[in-house]
Amino acid sequence: MVRYRMRSLSERPHEVHGQQVYGQEQGHNGQEEQGLSPEHVEVYERTHQGYSHHRRRRCSRRRLYRIHRRRHRSCRRRRRRSCRHRRRHRRGCRTRRRRCRRY
């Protein structure tokens, strides 16, 4: 599966399976205006695209969801323990009303 970086429409035309609609030349011209020589343009693209893909893989939604769920469960357990520990004042238990401080 091929993943693309999110870009504004004015920055560069839409890419289809790694090939640009209007040709390869246009993207290079846009970056040369910023003061990059043609040799550095390819290195610049490679390093920045690689970096963004690496970050995206590390922080997937599924992984964040799993971590969040795990923390939530452990917090809920702690809250229950604190309520059970104070058996005398069960009616006035404030921990149920309060949200978990970790988030």
From Swiss-Prot:
Pfam families: Protamine_P2
Residue numbers spanned by region Disordered: 1-103
Modified-residue entries (Phosphoserine), positions: S8, S10, S37
Disulfide bonds: none
Start-end of Basic and acidic residues biased regions: 8-17, 39-48
Compartments it resides in: Nucleus; Chromosome
Transmembrane stretches, start-end: none
Name of the molecule in the record: Protamine-2
Source organism per UniProt: Semnopithecus entellus
Species lineage: Eukaryota, Metazoa, Chordata, Craniata, Vertebrata
Gene name of this polypeptide: PRM2
